[in-house]
Structures are given as structure tokens and as C-alpha cells.
Design a protein with these regions (language model features):
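Structural marker of alpha-solenoid helical repeat scaffolds
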Residues: 33-34, 67, 101-102, 135, ...
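Register position in tetratricopeptide repeats
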Residues: 50, 84-85, 118-119, 152-153, ...
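Helix-start (N-cap) detector for alpha-helical repeat units in TPR-like alpha-solenoids
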Residues: 38-39, 72-73, 106-107, 140-141, ...
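Canonical positions in the second alpha-helix
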Residues: 30, 63-64, 97-98, 131-132, ...
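Terminal, low-structured helical/coil segments at or just beyond the last alpha-helical repeat
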Residues: 18-21, 186-220
């Protein structure tokens, strides 16, 4: 599934808000002339999301899903809009619809795991994260997400293992190394944390950005 076919960038620096609104107006007129055009409606909805017009985006995805109830891109981004509107149960329902038609879809599994965590459904979040790792064992992000859930639940050793697995699959991701440092500090394994911090500086992360973590290691 090309679920990122309507890829959204929330950096609107390239276009002013006025330009985005003008583009929306043009696409709205074109969509009125071609009501069955999914492409036009997806483009308009993506611009609505860029402007954080969650309700307008949701309504546009509603229009698409009325015609094509199983359109995965519309379901995914409507769920995204629902999340921003804090309508979490509706967001989860849309993600679940994607998984019903495309079992194991990485983006939907990831979204459901994070959404369950946001909803304080910790057991469901961890179950979903386990499923994510089992079905996508090559994805660094799958391990990192599970590690974050484990860390939040106080499962620190398990979190450390998963951060290490994420790093094995994406060794240049500085965030994973930073999360590993924080986890090592929580485990009071300060020497290992310092070694990881030194590695981060060699990777090009400014020492000033790591100052607080260095301080925590030295205040043991």
C-alpha cells in the first residue's frame, strides 16, 4: 500500500499560509468539477493538514471514504486528523480498518501502538509493539517504539535491549543513542553511559547538546 502517497510536510516555510489557502481554494474548485477525483481531494486534504485545519481535512477524507470506504491513505490521514482533534477512539477505529484490509501494515501498527500509549492503555500498547517487532524485525523504529513503551512502564532492562537492537539496525540515528544513554543512567551504569556519550560526540553531536546528560553521569 502506498500509504504515504499523500506525504505531508508540516514545514510550511516553502509556502506562506496565504499561498496554501489559495492552493486549497483552487483544488476545491477543481474537486467540485471532478467530484470522483481521489487525487484532487487527497491533495486538498493534505494542504488542510499542513494548515492544521483538522476538521476540514477530516471532512475531505470523509468525502473520499464515502466513495471508496477502504482507501488506506484516506483512512490513515483521517485517523491522523482525529488524533490531533483528540478523538482517539475514532482514530483507532480507522487504523484498525487499515489493518483489517492490510494485515501487518507497518505505519498502522506503529500508529496504534503509540495511540494506545497516549490513551494510557499500556498493556494494549505493549502488545501492539510486540506485534510490530515480530512482523517487522528489520525495522529499527519498531524496536525503538517498543523500548519507549517499556521504559515508560519501568521495564528498563528490556528497554535497553530494544534500544540496542534499534541501534544495530540504524547505527547513525543519534536519538536512539541518546535514549540508550538515558536508559543506562536509569540503570546506574554510568561508565557505559559516558562511553555512549563520547560516541555521540564522535558522530558529530555537539557536546553542548549533551551537557545535561554528561552532568547526570558525573552526579552519580
Amino acid at each position: 500500500m502506498a500509504i504515504l502517497a499523500a506525504t505531508i510536510s508540516f514545514n510550511v516555510g516553502a509556502q506562506t499560509k496565504k499561498e496554501l489557502r489559495d492552493s486549497i481554494a483552487v483544488l476545491a474548485r477543481e474537486a467540485d468539477m471532478h467530484p470522483d477525483s481521489i487525487e484532487l481531494r487527497l491533495r486538498k486534504a493534505a494542504l488542510n493538514l499542513q494548515l492544521e485545519q483538522w476538521q476540514y481535512a477530516k471532512e475531505e477524507y470523509d468525502n473520499i471514504l464515502t466513495l471508496f470506504p477502504n482507501n488506506a491513505t484516506a483512512l490513515y490521514f483521517r485517523a491522523f486528523a482525529y488524533e490531533r482533534m483528540r478523538r482517539y477512539d475514532l482514530a483507532k477505529a480507522d487504523y484498525d480498518k487499515i489493518l483489517a484490509h492490510i494485515p501487518g501494515n507497518f505505519e498502522a501498527l506503529l500508529a496504534v501502538a503509540l495511540l494506545n500509549q497516549k490513551m494510557k492503555r499500556h498493556t494494549e500498547a505493549l502488545d501492539q509493539a510486540n506485534r510490530l517487532v515480530n512482523q517487522h524485525p528489520d525495522k529499527a523504529l519498531a524496536y525503538a517504539v517498543r523500548a519507549g513503551i517499556e521504559h515508560e512502564r519501568g521495564m528498563i532492562e528490556l528497554a535497553l535491549y530494544d534500544y540496542e537492537q534499534a541501534i544495530k539496525r540504524d547505527s547513525q540515528n543519534a536519538e536512539y543513542h541518546i535514549y540508550k544513554v538515558e536508559t543506562l543512567i536509569d540503570l546506574k551504569r554510568f561508565e557505559e553511559a559516558l562511553q555512549e556519550l563520547n560516541l555521540l560526540t564522535k558522530m558529530g553531536v555537539a557536546r553542548a547538546e549533551l551537557a545535561e546528560l554528561y552532568k547526570r553521569c558525573k552526579q552519580r
